[in-house]
Amino acid sequence: MTSHWLFQLALLAIVVGWLVGAYNRLVRLRNAIVTAWEQIVAALVRRSDAMTAVAAAVREPLAAEAATLQALAEADAKLRTAADGVRQSRGRIADVSLWVTAEAALSSPASRLRALIELQPALLAEPPHGEQLAPALAAWREAEPRIQFARQGFNDAVDRYNRAIHQWPTRLVSMLFRFRPGGRV
């Protein structure tokens, strides 16, 4: 009778130990998503600051394009809001989708502004504007690959997490503690 009771206790300890280990693994993977997202946010802030500097440098010479500059500022603000939503939800699919939509909405005014600057190379040569514009454009160009690299890291973290919550027997823990799939960008 005593050995039967000890066997059950040992089995229970093994199951509880596995549950704790599986739960901690899922939490660690979910936290890796948050960390990877912070890398994207850091790159987005760099790009946003660079775009703001570019817009400020060309605001006067491109006064006729005030609508483009305004659209860029609004799209950037929406992107930052969406990025905060992803951070708070820890990569929930719906919030990631909103961010992807905001990123796509930013591309049009950003591309238009870049095209306007390329069509007017004198902007870079003019002393008051060119001195501010050249470093801001360089920072903007440098930010884009950083964002792509950070997105890849985020997607890798999401893939590892999603695989873990769908694999048997960890699937039981993910259902029990309501771990939800993460979204890719």
Which residues make up each language-model segment?
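A helix-centric hydrophobic-segment signal that preferentially recognizes long
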Residues: T2-V185
